[in-house]
A protein has these predicted regions:
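Domain-level recognition of soluble alpha/beta enzyme cores
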Residues: 166-195
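Alpha-helix C-terminal capping segments
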Residues: 49, 74-79, 140-148, 186-187
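Generic beta-sheet signal
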Residues: 10, 58, 148-157
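Active-site-proximal alpha-helix that buttresses catalytic centers in soluble enzyme cores
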Residues: 5-82, 109, 130
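Short active-site segment of divalent metal-dependent hydrolases/proteases
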Residues: 18, 158-159
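Phosphate-handling substructures
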Residues: 32-33, 78-138, 176, 188, ...
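Active-site signature of alpha/beta-hydrolase-fold catalytic machinery across serine-
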Residues: 74, 161, 165
Length: 197
């Protein structure tokens, strides 16, 4: 990967909670609307980003998926800047035919293939899903182009991959990173800081 400018600052956020998050359904690249809680999380992220960044105009990169776009629109109410740049490299990995199913349903169909989030290799076994290598390449491509302060609104597995790639973590380490809603990960100077409300 091309070296990242040490002065680059990335404020990485996961979209707010969705109906499918609440229901335990795998989303991948299918969409599900934010819940009332998810909209509140996005509002809180906007306020927190405004406190961290002041009222200076900030560039926002966002996944093209509806839940990320909705989160970015709510954040923009607090953080001024140009229209967000929609970048498909920030979208969630595709989970193929598993999208919309619960983990239990996938296990019933696929003889117990699903593990827990501490052993997330099962994500890359989805029929018609995205491979680890392809997923890693698109994240690397996005990350290598970042040159200034940017807010990135993305997804659970994608935020794991971005942070892991930035830190140079192993495959297992990056797939084990936590992905709560309502936090900001600040990537700068070769480190990642988790910022809570």
């Amino acid at each position: 990967m091309k070296a990242i400018d040490p002065a680059t600052e990335i404020y990485l956020v996961r979209h707010g909670e969705t109906e499918w998050n609440r229901d335990g359904r795998l989303q991948g690249q299918h969409n599900s609307s934010l819940t009332a809680r998810g909209r509140r999380q996005a509002e809180q992220l906007g306020r927190l980003l405004a406190r961290l960044l002041g009222r200076q105009q900030r560039l926002i990169n966002v996944s093209p998926l509806g839940r990320a776009l909705e989160t970015a629109a709510i954040i923009r109410q607090q953080v001024p800047g140009p229209e967000p740049i929609i970048d498909p490299r920030l979208q969630e990995m595709t989970l193929g035919s598993w999208e919309g199913l619960t983990r239990k349903e996938v296990n019933e169909q696929c003889n117990g293939v699903v593990g827990d989030d501490a052993n997330a290799e099962w994500w890359f076994r989805a029929p018609g899903g995205e491979s680890f290598d392809h997923f890693q390449q698109r994240v690397r491509s996005w990350l290598s182009e970042q040159r200034g302060p940017v807010i990135a609104v993305s997804h659970g597995i994608t935020t794991r991959m971005i942070r892991g790639e930035y830190l140079g973590l192993s495959r297992h380490e990056r797939l084990s990173l936590p992905v709560p809603h309502g936090v900001i990960w600040r990537l700068r100077g070769g480190g990642v800081e988790t910022i809570h409300q």
